């Protein structure tokens, strides 16, 4: 773990590992992990945002939207898998969780208060910082379909994890997603954070090793 690898070489190495391992799971997820030099206990050093991956995620994201009035239909028209108001809140409260992302309009936030216990631990609570609390539900749905992923630094360890595509992607597609994600994380450096912000960057696969990336090679061509 102490040797630094060129980003493109790391992608190729992991793709070759999957091929050579004879794993039945041939289309594995590539994941980016970034260790941040922040104090997660400090309110002014929280890192949470989102990024639209230029090559997409390679998987279908199931989107649920909590909205009122005509915005419920707008969400459905944009392609949301589920949309509703009180009845959808009740369904989630009763334990239904057949979605990957939850989007809510600002006027429904009082309804969502009762879902904190259910959604919080799963990291599914809508938040304005990552664009999941918005009045423009149609845009939020379209962005998510286009490959938008949200991320946040974990409270313990200050590590950001996010998927950057599938092993079926080309090296260029994975590299473009990797660079976009790293740039977005860099952009979200809290002003109160001192010292080295991005301490280490790793790329790993679902069933295999993680490789430490030389950050100087994370430059878009």
Task: For every predicted segment, state its role.
Residues 205-209:
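Glycine-rich beta-alpha junction loops
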Residues 10, 14, 75, 120, ...:
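Residue-level signature of catalytic and energy-coupling elements of molecular machines
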Residues 56-93:
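Glycine-rich active-site/cofactor-binding loop and its immediate structural neighborhood
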Residues 22-30, 188-200:
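Flexible, glycine/charged-enriched surface loops at secondary-structure junctions
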Residues 213-221:
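Short, charged, intrinsically disordered terminal tails
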Residues 80-188:
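Long, charge-patterned amphipathic alpha-helical coiled-coil/hairpin "stalk" segments used as oligomerization
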Residues 5-71:
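Translation machinery proteins
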């Amino acid at each position: 773990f102490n040797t630094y690898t060129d980003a493109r070489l790391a992608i190729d190495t992991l793709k070759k590992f999957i091929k050579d391992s004879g794993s039945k799971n041939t289309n594995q997820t590539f994941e980016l992990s970034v260790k941040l030099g922040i104090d997660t206990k400090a309110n002014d050093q929280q890192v949470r945002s989102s990024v639209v991956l230029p090559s997409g995620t390679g998987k279908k994201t199931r989107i649920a939207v909590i909205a009122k009035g005509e915005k419920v239909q707008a969400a459905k028209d944009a392609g949301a898998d589920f949309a509703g108001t009180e009845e959808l809140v009740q369904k989630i409260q009763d334990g239904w969780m057949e979605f990957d992302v939850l989007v809510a309009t600002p006027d429904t936030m009082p309804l969502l208060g009762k879902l904190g216990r259910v959604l919080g631990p799963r990291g599914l609570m809508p938040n304005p910082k990552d664009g999941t609390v918005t009045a423009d539900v149609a845009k939020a749905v379209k962005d998510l379909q286009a490959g938008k992923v949200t991320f946040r630094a974990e409270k313990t360890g200050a590590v950001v994890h996010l998927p950057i595509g599938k092993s079926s992607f080309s090296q260029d597609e994975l590299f473009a997603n990797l660079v976009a994600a790293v740039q977005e994380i860099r952009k979200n450096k809290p002003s109160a954070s001192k010292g080295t912000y991005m301490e280490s960057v790793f790329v790993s696969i679902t069933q295999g090793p993680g490789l430490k990336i030389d950050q100087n090679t994370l430059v878009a061509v």
